[in-house]
Curated annotation (Swiss-Prot):
GO cellular component: cytosol; mitochondrion
UniProt keyword annotations, A-Z: 2Fe-2S, Iron, Iron-sulfur, Metal-binding, Mitochondrion, Redox-active center, Transit peptide
Role this protein plays: May only reduce GSH-thiol disulfides, but not protein disulfides. Participates probably to the maturation of iron-sulfur proteins and to the regulation of the redox state of the BOLA proteins.
Identification of the protein by name: Monothiol glutaredoxin-S15, mitochondrial
Compartment(s) of residence: Mitochondrion
GO MF: 2 iron, 2 sulfur cluster binding; disulfide oxidoreductase activity; metal ion binding
Organism encoding this protein: Arabidopsis thaliana
Length: 169
């Protein structure tokens, strides 16, 4: 009886894809019937500060978010705005973009857009591009993971990154 009940519970849970409410956002990724990743992000006032997203830019900062994005793009030969960080991407598209860029042994600067919704909106406004990741090379907006992958396959990315310091190819 217990095995049957737990089996039905597991099957029911496995069929859940995503839940959204005003208090909670949750998503799970399944592969071959097995849960590979699950996340829950509380978004209510009762959430302890340790579990709330952090804001990297102090609210009283004299730099506007637009200035921060402009400086990021200008000061970093390879800049990626992504979900997560290069060492731990939080979505498949961000992971793909990082893996492609890492093939060229170039220093990758990044910002985690999951940590600051206002920064995320500022980046969208700056690039006029709605999705993430967003990759800039030598100050030029390139696009997302699909564009980087296509450039890699066509040999264009190697040319674009040819004189970026740290490139050992």
């Amino acid at each position: 009886m217990a095995a049957s009940l737990s089996s039905r519970l597991i099957k029911g849970i496995a069929n859940l894809k995503a839940v959204r409410s005003s208090r909670l956002t949750s998503a799970s990724v399944y592969q071959n019937g097995m849960m590979r990743f699950s996340s829950t992000v509380p978004s209510d006032s009762d959430t302890h500060d340790d579990f709330k997203p952090t804001q990297k830019v102090p609210p009283d900062s004299t730099d506007s978010l637009k200035d921060i994005v402009e400086n990021d793009v200008k000061d970093n030969p390879v800049m990626i705005y992504m979900k997560g960080v290069p060492e731990s991407p939080q979505c498949g598209f961000s992971s793909l973009a990082v893996r492609v860029l890492q093939q060229y042994n170039v220093p990758i600067s990044s910002r985690n857009i999951l940590e600051d919704q206002e920064l995320k909106n500022a980046v969208k406004s700056f690039s006029h591009w709605p999705t993430f990741p967003q990759i800039f090379i030598k100050g030029e907006f390139i696009g997302g993971s699909d564009i980087i992958l296509n450039m890699h396959k066509e040999g264009e990315l190697e040319q674009k990154l040819k004189d970026v310091s740290g490139n050992q190819d």
